[in-house]
C-alpha cells in the first residue's frame, strides 16, 4: 500500500523512526494513515490499525484517500489502470477505525483525528492541566485551522490567514471584517532567488468576504466532533447570530439527522459524521 501511494518508506522504516523518536525523548508522537485505497482489503486495514495501536502513539490521523488531479493515481484512474476509490468501502474502513480506536482508548475529537484518552489539557490554547480523564491530546496546530483562527506561515509553500481589517496594502472596504489568505512560492530555489533579490515571495492571495468567512467557520468548526461550532464564538467572530445567517441550512440538516444542537453549539450527528462532506458543502457559497 505504501508503494502504491508513492511513499518511499516501508512499514519497518516507520517502526524504526518511531523508536528513534521515543529514544530521543519525544513524549507526544502522531502517526498518519490513508485509507480507502482502490480494492483495499478490510483485514489488511484492521491489521494496520493493530500495528498502530501496538506502537501506542499519543495521536493518530486517518485520512480518506482523495484522488488529486495531476498525480500518477489520477492518471491511473482516468485510464482505467486502477478502479476509482469506493465510497462504501471507505465508509466501512472508517467505521472499523472508529470502533477499534475507541476500544483502544483513543477519543475521536475531529473527523480525521484521534487522541489518547486522558492526555489532553483543560484549555488546549493555554496548556492548562486537565481534570477530565476522558479528554484526548489534540493537535494544537490544526486547532487553529478548525477554529478558523489566524496563523502566519513562513517559508516556501507556507500558507497564512489573517482577519481584516488590519494594515495591509491589499485590504479593501469590501473585505473588512472578513479576512485575507495567501501562500508563498513553493519551489525552494525560486523562493530563495526572490528573497535574495528583495522581491515578494507571495504567489497567491485572496480576500475572504464576510459570507465566505462565516461559511468557513461552520465548515471547519463542524469537523470538531466533540466541540462543534459555538453560537457564542460565532457571534463574537462575525457579529451576527449563526441562525440568522444559516437558518435554512440548519433546519434542513437537523431534519436529515445530520446535525444536532444543545442550544449552545451545533455538532455533527453519527450520520453527519459519515456524510460530512455533504454537511460542509451546505455552508459554502
Which positions does each model-derived feature cover?
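Minor-groove-contacting beta-hairpin "wing" of winged helix-turn-helix DNA-binding domains
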Residues: 265-269
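C-terminal scaffold of the Radical SAM
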Residues: 1-240
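Structural preference for long, well-ordered alpha-helical segments in enzyme cores
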Residues: 215-218, 249, 279
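Short amphipathic alpha-helical interaction segments
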Residues: 239-254
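A short, conserved structural fragment
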Residues: 254-264
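Short, amphipathic alpha-helical interaction segments positioned at domain boundaries
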Residues: 271-285
